[in-house]
Design a protein with these regions (language model features):
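Active-site microenvironment for binding and transforming phosphate-containing groups
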Residues: 1-147
Length: 147
């Protein structure tokens, strides 16, 4: 799994988790059907994840990526968590059961519409943070840069 060391700037592609030191920038390229999760630490650093609807070989599945972010964050204090991207493409349950994990013939939940509140709760629960720290923003396709 791609967990990279803390650096000044980092590019996180689908299924990757990484960290930047205070003042660093997280770059999430080609966010289309994905969501990005950025944990802003009290010391100014950031832990980020580029969550993909479908697993990229060798990278984190959607139902494992929050655990990787939580492990990376550790006991450090969290100021805020930002979830951005294709909000309408994601059911909150994808963070607990990835699309790939459904058996043939098993019904995969399909979102009827955007559920920012459900996504915020799912991310807060997955990271062990309070719901009040999590914001969700639907963004058009493209690269995301978090300074």
């Amino acid at each position: 799994m791609a967990v990279t060391p803390a650096t000044a700037n980092i590019r996180l592609t689908e299924g990757q988790v990484g960290e930047v030191a205070p003042g660093g920038t997280l770059i999430y390229p080609g966010v289309t059907s994905c969501l990005t999760v950025t944990v802003r630490l009290r010391d100014g650093g950031k832990v980020g994840a580029h969550a993909s609807l479908f697993q990229v070989p060798g990278e984190y599945r959607s139902d494992r990526i929050l655990a990787a972010v939580k492990q990376r964050t550790g006991a450090r204090r969290v100021r805020a968590v930002e979830v951005r991207g294709a909000v309408g493409a994601w059911a909150p349950s994808y963070f607990t059961k990835a699309i790939e994990s459904y058996a043939e013939g098993e019904r995969v939940p399909v979102p009827a519409g955007p559920d920012p509140e459900g996504l915020a709760r799912a991310v807060a629960d997955g990271l062990g943070q309070s719901r009040g720290k999590v914001t969700v923003e639907d963004l058009p396709d493209g690269d995301q840069r978090v300074d």
